[in-house]
């Protein structure tokens, strides 16, 4: 049995891009493809946008990453802008959608453990056929058998409402 050095997480299509140009991918032979995903999930940025390249270069010249052990004037300023322009009171930066969903799960459970005192409120409702990520909690939050296969036992505490069926969600 041979295994790819790059773990296969999706069935791969035949396109093998080596470069991107705004909303296009360019393969090894120079063929251009319109990229309707323009990245995926948290990276919907397109390809080679000069403004983004400039911002990344500027940041890379000053500071690449700061642990949560330290304060970050730039991070704090961005968090304040987000709080000022949204419903949020606080912000937690993550690097992936799965991490964001994990944080939402933990925040909801922590609220009931620490804030309202009803530690028995641990069940969360998610919708059928939804994708939440590839961590154990986000796989457990999905009702898709293909996501569960090979990862049993799942984490407890999720109920699945039929998508687009508010009455079913209310009944849970």
Kindly give the residue locations of the regions a language model identified.
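Active-site-adjacent loop/helix segments that line or gate small-molecule/cofactor pockets in enzymes
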Residues: 1-24, 69, 162
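Short, acidic, Ser/Thr-enriched surface-loop or helix-capping motifs
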Residues: 27-28
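Short, well-ordered beta-strand elements within core beta-sheets of diverse protein domains
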Residues: 24, 43-45, 159-160
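Solvent-exposed alpha-helices and their adjacent loops that cap or buttress functional pockets
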Residues: 16-18, 83-86, 116-118, 150-153, ...
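Short hydrophobic segments within beta-strands
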Residues: 125-127
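Conserved active-site and cofactor/substrate-binding residues in soluble primary-metabolism enzymes
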Residues: 1, 20, 47, 51, ...
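Glycine-rich loop-to-alpha-helix module at the N-terminal edge of alpha/beta enzyme cores
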Residues: 32-119, 123
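PLP-dependent aminotransferase-class I/II
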Residues: 129-172
